[in-house]
Amino acid sequence: MDVEKLIAESKKAREQAYVPYSKFPVGAALLAEDGTIYHGCNIENSAYSMTNCAERTAFFKAVSDGVRSFKALAVVADTEGPVSPCGACRQVIAEFCNGSMPVYLTNLKGDIEETTVAKLLPGAFSKEDLSYAAEQ
C-alpha cells in the first residue's frame, strides 16, 4: 500500500473523533500484515484520564480482532508540523511492532515525517525486560 493511501485513511478516521473538550481530532490508520487497515480516532471523556488516543484505538481494534503483525502506521491532526504520538501511544506501538516499522506522522497541510518505531521510543520497555526480572 502506498503512503498517500494510508494517510488518506488516517484522515477518514479523524472524521470520527469524539473530541467535545479539546476540539483536537486525531486520526490513525494501521496497516496489518494481511493488508487490512484498522482505523482509530481519539475518543475523549469528561474524566480526561479515560480518553483514548487515535493510535491506541487503532491498535486495540486490531488486537481485539486477533491481529498481531503490522506493516505501517499513519497519524494525522491539524497541527503546525507533523503530529507526534504521546508517550503512552509510543509504548503501545512498540509493544506490537518491530523497531524498523515505518510510522508516518502528518498534518492537514500535507507535511509528512517518516520515522520508525525505534526512533519514536528508543529503549522501550519490553517483554525482554520482564523475562530478565522473572529469571532473578
UniProtKB/Swiss-Prot annotation:
Its EC number is 3.5.4.5. Transmembrane segments: none annotated. Residues 1-128 form the CMP/dCMP-type deaminase domain. GO terms for cellular component: cytosol. PROSITE patterns: CYT_DCMP_DEAMINASES_2 (PS51747). GO terms for biological process: cytidine deamination. Substrate binds at N42, I43, E44. Its cofactor is Zn(2+). InterPro entries: CMP_dCMP_dom, Cyt/Deoxycyt_deaminase, Cyt_deam_tetra, Cytidine_deaminase-like. Zn(2+) binds at C53, C86, C89. It catalyses: cytidine + H2O + H(+) = uridine + NH4(+); 2'-deoxycytidine + H2O + H(+) = 2'-deoxyuridine + NH4(+). Keywords: Hydrolase, Metal-binding, Zinc. It is an enzyme of class 3 (hydrolase). It holds the Pfam family dCMP_cyt_deam_1. One of its GO terms (molecular function) is zinc ion binding. The active site is at E55. Belongs to the cytidine and deoxycytidylate deaminase family. This enzyme scavenges exogenous and endogenous cytidine and 2'-deoxycytidine for UMP synthesis. This is Cytidine deaminase. The lineage of its organism: Bacteria, Bacillati, Bacillota, Bacilli, Bacillales. The gene is cdd.
